[in-house]
Each structure stands twice: as C-alpha cells, then as structure tokens.
Swiss-Prot record:
InterPro entries from the UniProt entry: ThrE-like_N (IPR010619), ThrE/Ser_Exporter (IPR051361), ThrE_2 (IPR024528)
Keyword Membrane: yes
Highest rank taxon of the organism: Eukaryota
UniProt protein name: Pheromone-regulated membrane protein 10
Length: 995
C-alpha cells in the first residue's frame, strides 16, 4: 500500500501497513495565509486556464436543496500534492474539483485496490500522475461508467424534467460510508485542517454550482424545470433512485395531485376513491431509505428470538450482576398456549405460577404482582368506586364466553414510572442510618411509593416508627455486653470489604454500569466492619442483592410489555377505523381492549381521528397519541380484524402474535381490482333501477352504461387527484343528469324513463353510509362526531341536487322539448312480482364492491331480501312517510343480523351493511326528491318564470337533504330497537359489534 509523506512526520513502512491491514494517513497542516496568496496571484493566464478546465472537465453539481456536508478533514491526496510540488498547487486550488468537500478513507475498505496503489505510487513519487495533480480520487472502476452514464442521461433528458441533475453521484455514498469508517482513526495531533479554509471551499463550490446551474437553465425552460423539480427530492435532500419521476412529482401532477389518494367518499362505497396507482408507502422503508445504492440498512423481518438475546445482552451491560444469575428467563414464543396474551411477563417472573395466573382472568387481584410494583391504582375505579350504573353485571352470565370483566382496580404501571424505578437505588441500605432522624416518607423511592400506592383503595394504616433505629439497636446491645472490639481480623477484612462493597456504597455499582441515578444526595456513613459472629447477615445481603437484580429484570421486561400492548391498542384502533367498524361503538371497543390488557387508557373519537391517552398514575403524567386515517369499508378485512380482536379479548392468542397478524392484514391487497369494481358498479346501477326507482326493461342496459362512467370517475379519476375528488359528486351528477335527460327525451319519453336512469346511475354515490353513521352517533350521545357527519351528509345531498339541476339545465338549453317527468309512467314499470329478483343481485354487487368474501354473500342476501319485503309492504300503507318504512325495514334487518351474530357467532356488521344500503334508495325513491331540482332547471331554461314559482322551487331544492335525514333517522331508530331486543343487557366483554 502507498504511504504518504507529511511535514516532519514519519510514515510507517508498507510491511507494517500490510501487517496491521490499514494505513496511517498523516495529513499536513494547511496554511491559510499561503492559500490566500495563491488566490491573489491569479492573472489572465490562470483565468484562461480556469475557464478551459471548466469547459473540459465535468463539474459536479448538486441540487439546490442539497448541500455537501462540511467535513473537518480535507482530501489527503489534495493536501499532500499541494505541499510537495509548488507548480501544481495553483492548478489544484484553481480546479473546482479541489473545492469539493474532502473525505477520508479506511485502508480496509480499499484493500482490493492495493495492487493499483502500489503500481501508481512509484509514478506519483517521480512525476505525479494527472489525477493526483488535480486532486481527484478514483473510488472504483465503476465511477467512470457512472460518469459516462450521467453525461448521456443529462443529454437525453435535459429538455424534459432534468431528474438526473437532482440525483447524487454514485460514488458519494461510498465516500460517506468510508468517511464514517475512519472517524475513530483520526488524530488531531498528527495533522489538521483549518476549519475556515474548509468552510470557504464548501461555500465556493456551492455558489459556483448554483451559478453554473442558473446560466444553463435560465429563461422559461429553467422556470419550468424548477417547477418540475419542486419537492422532488426525498427527505434527505436527494432522490434515492434513477427512475423517471412519477406523475405526482411533475408540475402537472402537483396541480392535479396525482397519486395523493384522495379522500374517502360519502356514498354507498366509502373509501373507493382512496385507491392510488402508486404502491402503499412503507414508513420503515422511507426512514431507512429505499434505494439500492443509498447505503441504507435493509429492513428485515423481526426475529423475536434474536431480539430476546439482544435484550439479555443489553440487560447484562446495564446490570452486570445479572450475568451470573440462573438463566430461567426465557422468551415466550408467539405460538404459546391459550390464555397468555395479557400475562406475557408471567413466564419471565415466575414460570411455576404461569398456569395459575392464566386460569384467573382477574389479574388485578393478584397480590404477588402488586408487590413487584408492576401495577398502579386505577384512578377511575378509585374515583367512582363500585357504584357505576354502567357496570352492573348481575344479570349477565359471567361463566359464558362473553363473561363480564369488571373495571380493574389496578392497571399496569406506565413507562416513565418504570424507568424511574429501574434507575433508582434502593434506600434501605446502611447509609440511611446516619440520617435516621428523618421521616421515613422522605427517603422513599418511587418504587416504594408505587408499592404503597397499589393498596390505595384499601387505606392501609401507616406507622410512625423509625425502623432504622431498630436495625442498629440490637447490634449496639450485643457489642456493649460482650465488650467485643471493633478491630477486624486481618484475614477477614478484605473479604468483608468485597462482600459489602455493593451494599455499603450502592452508587459505586451504578457508576460502574454507567446507569443514571435519581436518588437524593445524602451523606454516606463510614464503612463498618462485620462482626464474625453475625454470619447470617452475609446470607441476607446476598439474597437481597439477588432480589434487586431480579426486580431490575422484571422492570425491564415490564417496560417492553407495556409498549407492546400500547402499540397493539393503536394498531387495532386504526384497523377498525380503516375497514368500517361502527363508528358510534369505537370508543367502547377500545375501552374493552384496554380493560382486558390492563392498560390505563382514555379514548375520544372524532370523524377520521381517535385521540388515545395512556395514563401513568405514579408520575401523574399521560402519553397522548392521535390515530388518523381515511375511513372506508372493507368487509373481508373487517371480519379478519374482528377475529383478531376477539382472540385477544378471550385470551386465545398473545399480543405480539396479534400485532403480527394485524401488520400482515394491513399490507394485504384488496381482493378485487379496480376494473372489476367499475364493472360491478355499472351492474349494481342496472339492478337497482327496476325495484327502487320504477325503471323498465329497456332502462337496464342504459343505466349499466351510465353507471360505468360514474364508476370510472370514482375509482380512477377521483383516486388520482385530490382536487377532483372534492368536486366528484357534482361532476358525476352533472354528467348523469345530462345523459339521462337526453336519452329520456327520445320519442317523447315513451321509450326510456329519465328519472329511473338518472337516479339508478347515482344510487351508489348517495350519502347513505355517512348519514347512517351520523344518525347512529347522535342517537348514542356522541354529539360532536354525529353533528359533524350529519351536517356533511346534508351538504353532500345538496351537492348532488345542484349537479342534477345544472346537468338538466344544460341539456334544456341544447334541446327545448326535453322531458321534465320526475316519475316513470305506470305502464313502463317492471311487474312487482319480478322486482324481488333484482334485490339479491344488487346485494351481491354491494358486497363485492365493498370487498366482501363469497362465503359472506348468502347471509347478506337473506337478510337483505327479508328487509326489502318488510319495506315493500310497509310502503303500501305509509306511502308518504319514508321514515316509518325505513324504520320497519331496519328493525327487521337488525333483528336478523344480531341473531346471526349471537347464534352462529358471525359478525353482524358485515351481514347488515348491504341490507341497510338497500333501504336507502327505496326511501329516497318514495318521494322522488332526488329530482326535485328539475323544476329549477326548467325555470333556468325558460325566462317566463314568476316569483311565486321561484320561491316554491327554493324550498323544493332542499327537499332531497330533508328526505335523507328522515330516512337516516328511521334507520337508526330501527337498528337501536333491534339491538335492544336481541341484546337487552349488551355485551360487556367484547362490545356489541353491530350497527
């Protein structure tokens, strides 16, 4: 390997370098004054030489958002060449490459190039090579290829986006890696660099690169280039790969917000517009870097056995005494036996009593765990006591599967209190005898206070005796009567000091382990010799030391257990919100989960957001998390989430296994592609047209075609643009109304029905789901979330009405004799005995669009058809009261769904939701309020309108919103009444998973 010469410093021989496998690069000290003089000598010749080198050499340009890191060390070859030859110093300083931030290398990393270095060392010592005189470093042979590739890419893509200019050099990552490898080898005494000199070099290269970039991309072309490169770099200031930019990174893409995902819709297919063309982002990949050549660490699957070994090593570092203990603390694999989900620390604490702890569900009454300080008092239980009317469980079956779980008297201690307890020293040492006059409560640690705090509900009496005096009293009496001297024997003194070193000076052991200590500073008592007669004290001290070590291990495992449980609670919350769990019962689900896992948690739900607070009673603190997501409906994933939720609640699987299953479920793709969903969208529109809106046989294919257009707008266009998703409902209703009125006007409305085509095509974007959730939340006393959803649903309905009015008016301007019928003729309708055949087909379409499995469809069809029969006959008697018919149909649906959940142990939500969606179009069609704006369209196209008619039309334009509210109120009343009949006392263990 080549050795470098310095100013007065001796270098090692090549044989020594080969033996030690590294080179000691000795860097000279750069003279700042000499550097300035060299710059002041610049003449016209040197300026011409500078310009020529700039044109010949390839300048390294960084993007505007990326600045090279300021390194303390300069390039070894550059600085050595500047001191060895004065003739090449001017060229080196003038060369822009020399101003780049320099790097240092570890010889072990470039060991493969040692042969080339040996060959080039002779030449460089004689005359010096071109590369060394210019101060450039050859990283590897692939750099030349990458430079040629960069030049070719810059020529080909210079006019388009210019993404190659924003990519870092491939060798820069290697340099950064090698720079970090040699940080520990640098000695500032051997050779250094002036920091101001290095700072000036960095500033000069950044300014020169920016000026050169500005000259090259000036004018309109440069402006568009800046727009296209806006926010194109990653979180670290540069892109991770050399691929072409996606649509979301270009100027047009940012205007239309391609790939942003859009917001969730409010129709019968919530979340359909949340699909994106891009892959779902991986947070770990974004943090660690997803490029192949970015030098980031590849994220791999978690190996829990390996983590267990690492945790043991970490404990051994912090607590060295734990290495000599009995290795009885083994990791509990995920495929453990049933009943070990909540007591995951039990095998680590006491393996013999693990089975006993699993058999008893009420872990809070276990006094052994309370002694270890793992539990803290449940403040809610202390405040309200046992007189909570909501927790009366006298009429519930505790022995059954859904047995009642009372609010725990104690919950797991928080993370902060456990950390403080882990790093606090015990206060019951002999050093406390010097301050025996102090009150015992003043010397308590947080661990001792927490142990007393576990018995707060029982108000245990306290004593004012000073037990520290009792400890020293008997010893003084023995010494007094036996007249023994305090002089230790020579052979026993060293042994006694070694035995009691940790006990007499507890801070010294913590200093050895480099642990922080939160103990109050107090004077230490002088060392006392141990009486040889008192042999039993040694045994007690050993046992006490072992007990403290076991307590530290328990606390360490307890902290990881608490973090795992809190993470699972947030994951299950996000999954339930994503896949369409009943929003008015989300707080109940989370409360039940935290109660079973013995976590002190409080939950507040807002639309699209859940605020989670984990309390710590010992430190009077709380940790607040906000879980946000775009809510939608995915019936298959909702069923899987419910299965995982029930398995954890009933102690069938552990928390870590449930977390792994949830992660796998979230990453799983949807069952049906967007193109299939568009086809199902059109098929569903065709099926709902005859039985809900009175369409004929000829209206079915027309409605199918128009429904395909609406489905494409929702699943493709709306999912690619955030801006368009805001006006999707208006544009879809305009297109549908325009096409439907044009087709309905053929042959003077004798062939096709305008109202059936228009309402059938818009049936799947009716605000049925969101207004249903709003009414259920209002009825369950969740005023904030219910009011927000209800008001949004009303405005959403007005959007649809405005779009229908505008589309009909546009066609009225084109064709003066357009139809204005809001109802189909009686002779045009399908016979009533055939309408029931379209209901199961529409139910299948609704289930498949919402990603339901095929095995879930039979139950959906039975419940949906039964509910429609009730609605049909109720509509014959209450023709003008849509809320009555909706309430009767929803009551039937709720009874069947809850019975299915209770008898066959299914999930009522997935079985009831398509049946409820069938009730919404039927209620809307009873008054034809969706086409109430057709009169306003006629008013716009005909100028002879009076003030009376305009006032009546203003009231009719709001009729669609009022009809939606009436239908939703009837549905919510029917659902709550059905839940009351089937579950008169509710489900106190898992929560009622129904609408």
């Amino acid at each position: 390997m080549s050795s470098h010469k310095g100013d007065g410093n001796d270098s090692m021989s090549s044989d020594e370098d080969a033996n030690e496998f590294r080179s000691h690069i000795q860097l000279p000290r750069v003279d700042l004054a000499n550097y300035r003089k060299q710059h002041q000598r610049g003449s016209s010749k040197t300026n011409i030489a500078k310009a020529g080198k700039k044109l010949k050499g390839k300048s390294v340009r960084f993007p505007d958002s990326y600045g090279p890191r300021d390194t303390i060390l300069s390039n070894s070859s550059t600085t050595n060449n500047s001191t060895e030859s004065s003739g090449s110093s001017d060229e080196e300083c003038d060369d822009p490459d020399s101003r780049l931030p320099s790097f240092k290398f570890n010889a072990t990393d470039v060991k493969g190039e040692s042969g080339d270095a040996h060959e080039g060392s002779d030449g460089s010592s004689d005359g010096g090579s071109d590369d060394e005189s210019r101060g450039s470093i050859k990283f590897s042979d692939s750099n030349d290829d990458s430079d040629r590739e960069d030049e070719r890419r810059s020529r080909t893509s210079r006019g388009s986006v210019g993404s190659s200019s924003s990519k870092p050099l491939k060798g820069s990552d290697d340099v950064n890696e090698k720079e970090t490898n040699l940080d520990h080898d640098y000695d500032p005494q051997e050779g250094g660099t002036d920091i101001t000199d290095q700072w000036k070099r960095t500033q000069s290269v950044s300014s020169s690169s920016k000026s050169f970039d500005g000259e090259k991309h000036s004018g309109i072309k440069g402006i568009f280039r800046k727009f296209s490169l806006a926010d194109h770099h990653g979180a670290h200031g540069f892109s991770n790969d050399y691929e072409e930019p996606s649509n979301s990174d270009t100027f047009l893409g940012r205007v239309l917000s391609f790939g942003s995902g859009g917001g969730g819709g409010g129709g019968l297919i919530p979340g359909a517009s949340r699909r994106s063309r891009e892959k779902e982002g991986d947070e770990e990949k974004e943090v660690g870097g997803g490029g192949e050549d970015d030098g980031a660490v590849e994220m791999k699957r978690l190996d829990f056995s390996q983590l267990n070994n690492e945790a043991k090593k970490l404990i051994a570092v912090h607590v060295p005494e734990a290495a000599n203990m009995d290795q009885s603390f083994t990791y509990d694999e995920p495929n453990q036996s049933a009943g070990s989900s909540r007591n995951s620390t039990a095998p680590l604490i006491n393996p013999d009593n693990a089975q006993e702890a699993d058999d008893d569900h009420k872990h809070t009454d276990d006094e052994d765990q309370g002694k270890h300080g793992f539990y803290a008092p449940n403040l809610d239980y202390i405040i309200r006591g046992n007189d909570d009317p909501e927790d009366q469980h006298l009429l519930l079956d505790e022995s059954g599967e859904d047995g009642y779980i009372a609010p725990p008297k104690q919950v797991h201690a928080g993370v902060l209190s456990s950390l403080l307890k882990l790093y606090q020293n015990p206060q019951d040492e002999k050093s406390s005898a010097s301050l025996s006059s102090r009150a015992p409560s003043d010397g308590k640690t947080l661990a001792e206070e927490q142990e007393f705090g576990t018995d707060m509900p029982y108000h245990m009496p306290t004593s004012s005796l000073d037990f520290t005096k009792l400890k020293s009293g008997p010893q003084k009496l023995v010494n007094k009567f036996t007249h023994r001297s305090n002089k230790p024997q020579p052979g026993k003194e060293a042994e006694a000091d070694d035995e009691d070193e940790d006990e007499e000076n507890p801070d010294q052991a913590y200093e050895k382990a480099n642990l922080p200590s939160f103990q109050n500073a107090r004077p230490k008592a002088p060392k006392k010799t141990i009486d040889p007669v008192n042999v039993s004290s040694k045994f007690h001290k050993k046992m006490k030391r072992k007990k403290i070590q076991q307590q530290k291990l328990r606390i360490t495992v307890h902290i990881s257990d608490i973090l795992q449980r809190q993470r699972f609670i947030m994951m299950i919350c996000k999954a339930l919100m994503l896949y369409g769990a009943p929003t008015h019962r989300l707080e109940e689900y989370m409360t039940m989960t935290s109660r079973v896992l013995e976590i002190d948690g409080q939950f507040v739900y807002f639309p699209g957001c859940m605020i989670v607070s984990f309390g710590d009673a010992a430190t009077r603190t709380s940790e607040v998390h906000i879980v946000r997501c775009n809510q939608g409906v995915n019936l298959s994933k909702l069923s899987d989430t419910h299965t995982i939720y029930k398995a954890v609640i009933h102690d069938l699987i552990s928390v870590d296994e449930a977390s792994q299953q949830l992660e796998t479920l979230v990453r799983k793709k949807n069952q049906y592609s967007p193109w299939l969903s568009v086809f199902l969208y059109g098929f569903g529109s065709a099926m709902v047209c005859p039985f809900a809106f009175g369409g004929g046989w000829l209206d079915i294919p027309v409605t199918f075609g128009v429904g395909l257009c609406v489905g494409y707008l929702q699943f493709f266009v709306s999912s690619m643009s955030n801006l368009y998703s805001s006006v999707f409902e208006i544009t879809a209703s305009i297109v549908v109304s325009f096409i439907a009125r044009g087709i309905g006007s053929i042959n003077n409305s004798k062939t096709f029905c305008f109202s059936a085509i228009a309402q059938g095509s818009l049936a799947l974007i009716l605000p049925g789901y969101i207004i249903l959730c709003g009414s259920l939340e209002l009825q369950s006393r969740n005023i904030v979330a219910g009011s927000v959803r209800m008001f949004y649903a009303i405005i959403y309905s007005l959007f649809l009405g405005f779009g229908i009015t505008l589309g009909a008016a546009l066609f009225g301007w084109v064709y003066k004799n357009s139809t204005s019928d809001k109802k189909c003729r009686t002779s045009h309708n399908v016979n009533d005995k055939y309408r029931i055949l379209f209901v199961p087909m529409f139910t299948i379409c609704l289930g498949l669009i919402n990603q339901a499995r095929w095995r879930q469809l039979p139950v959906m069809m039975v419940i949906s058809c039964t509910g429609y029969v009730g609605t049909y006959f109720a509509g014959k008697h209450f023709s003008n009261v849509p809320e009555f018919t909706a309430a009767i149909g929803a009551f039937i649906v709720g009874i069947l769904g809850n019975v299915y959940s209770r008898v066959w142990k299914g999930m009522a939500v997935s079985a009831m939701l398509p049946a409820i969606f069938v009730q919404v179009p039927s209620g809307i069609a009873s008054q034809s309020s969706l086409l109430s704006g057709i009169q306003s369209a006629d008013q716009i196209t005909h100028s002879n309108s009076s003030s009376d008619s305009s006032s009546s039309d203003s009231s009719s334009s709001l009729s669609f919103g009022s009809t939606m509210v009436e239908v939703s109120i009837g549905i919510s009343v029917g659902l709550f009444a059905a839940a009351l009949v089937v579950y008169p006392f509710g489900k106190r263990r898992t929560g009622l998973f129904t609408l």
